[in-house]
Amino acid sequence: MTIALGKFTKDQNDLFDIMDDWLRRDRFVFVGWSGLLLFPCAYFAVGGWFTGTTFVTSWYTHGLASSYLEGCNFLTAAVSTPANSLAHSLLLLWGPEAQGDLTRWCQLGGLWTFVALHGAFGLIGFMLRQFELARSVQLRPYNAIAFSGPIAVFVSVFLIYPLGQSGWFFAPSFGVAAIFRFILFFQGFHNWTLNPFHMMGVAGVLGAALLCAIHGATVENTLFEDGDGANTFRAFNPTQAEETYSMVTANRFWSQIFGVAFSNKRWLHFFMLFVPVTGLWMSALGVVGLALNLRAYDFVSQEIRAAEDPEFETFYTKNILLNEGIRAWMATQDQPHENLIFPEEVLPRGNAL
């Protein structure tokens, strides 16, 4: 029996190796394999949004003006969702709705699906970029894991929620005032502020802001080695090996303030990661529930008592009446194609309004 010993050599001109060498080359802006997804999708999403807010009307989908060309400003311009009659169509430019006509495609709301889908894949590409770079420089992938929070929120709000409803029409349009209108819609039709998943999301985001402020201030407060620079940002070499702040001093300070303090830097920073990301994940789960029209808290006993006793009212019952007012106004304004006419008995009543 003959045993051949040797090293298998690949063809030096292998296409994969050539692409890998070019994509992962050290340059000012890293490209990488993830860049093949990130850069085109981000370019099309941002470009589609600028195009829509500049030129494209929402008259045919919402009966609204939504572009700079029509007189809107940065806060009121938007790329609006397609009409409710188009349901969940992808609205491809070459599809049966637009039939290759770019003007008709814009009028039907094709830019919204274009921006939403390219935006989602662009965000995923950015997360993959963080994975790829972390692996290249031998870091842990916690940055990419943390970025899954914003991705979960974007996908749940802009894609999963309208998929659970009758069409893309019920997703948020891409604009500042349009997002505010969507928030009011969520409150009126889903009582979103009383949803425990929303509460966890608020606690996560605001708690993270508090932790960030406390952490930054504490590190600044416990600096023990000043440099020659004019300010903090110029005083230290970013590649210095030794720390220049005191964890022991910080621990002593917060132990006196609260009675407890972080004694371990890993646990401290993991907690700062855990709080906002978990909050975002929880709020995304809540939106998925709303896509299925799941209800959260309904304090029916208070509603019944408020209906029977004119002198009994709580902040909850007042909010329920406000929600009814939002629904009564929004349903007729936002869905004129439904020809909704509300009888007097279902319109808002009582002293809450």
UniProtKB/Swiss-Prot annotation:
The modification Phosphothreonine is found at T2. The gene is psbD. The D1/D2 heterodimer binds P680, chlorophylls that are the primary electron donor of PSII, and subsequent electron acceptors. It shares a non-heme iron and each subunit binds pheophytin, quinone, additional chlorophylls, carotenoids and lipids. There is also a Cl(-1) ion associated with D1 and D2, which is required for oxygen evolution. The PSII complex binds additional chlorophylls, carotenoids and specific lipids. A plastoquinone binds at H215, F262. This is Photosystem II D2 protein. It is found in: Plastid, Chloroplast thylakoid membrane. One of its GO terms (cellular component) is chloroplast thylakoid membrane. InterPro entries: D1/D2, Photo_II_D1/D2_sf, Photo_RC_L/M, Photo_RC_L/M_CS, PSII_PsbD/D2. Chlorophyll a ChlzD2 binds at H118. Belongs to the reaction center PufL/M/PsbA/D family. Gene3D superfamilies: Photosystem II protein D1-like (1.20.85.10). The modification N-acetylthreonine is found at T2. Photosystem II (PSII) is a light-driven water:plastoquinone oxidoreductase that uses light energy to abstract electrons from H(2)O, generating O(2) and a proton gradient subsequently used for ATP formation. It consists of a core antenna complex that captures photons, and an electron transfer chain that converts photonic excitation into a charge separation. The D1/D2 (PsbA/PsbD) reaction center heterodimer binds P680, the primary electron donor of PSII as well as several subsequent electron acceptors. D2 is needed for assembly of a stable PSII complex. It comes from Pisum sativum. It is a multi-pass membrane protein.
